[in-house]
């Protein structure tokens, strides 16, 4: 599945469907990425060692590029769809909330890299699907690499 990112503004999310699953694609602000290490102690799996993601997303950002987050938008607890709460200090989630996602079914909370907070019913981070970029503004979900023209 190809997604045009050229109109996705910083701080926005789109949710296309891939293999009947919602894909959360977020254009992260630099401040969103900068805050990620600040709450590692509050996460169940901050290094994503027990979570599902391609090797290239096994980093603090859980992404190929800092500015684009790609997740399967299904809670790893019981399969509900987490809602976006990107604003730090959101009144619903409290002053210490760094921004991220909250599952409306049982309250699991995930940061802006899809990592699950301690105290959440979900046991693992949100899944990162395979994906690659074709140029700066085209995201291809479902593949780990894109063949270049003339490659054998």
What role is predicted for each listed range?
Residues 1-21:
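C-terminal segment of N-terminal export signals and the immediately downstream linker at the start
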Residues 4-6, 17, 26, 83, ...:
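Residues in well-ordered beta-strands of folded domains
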Residues 8-10, 30, 136:
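Short strand-connecting beta-turns/loops that link adjacent beta-strands
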Residues 13, 26, 35, 113, ...:
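Short acidic, gly/pro-rich beta-turn/loop elements at beta-sheet edges
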Residues 17-23, 27-34:
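Short, surface-exposed binding/anchoring microloops in extracellular/periplasmic proteins
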Residues 29-45:
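Short Gly/aromatic-enriched secondary-structure transition segments
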Residues 41-152:
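Rieske [2Fe-2S] iron-sulfur-binding domain
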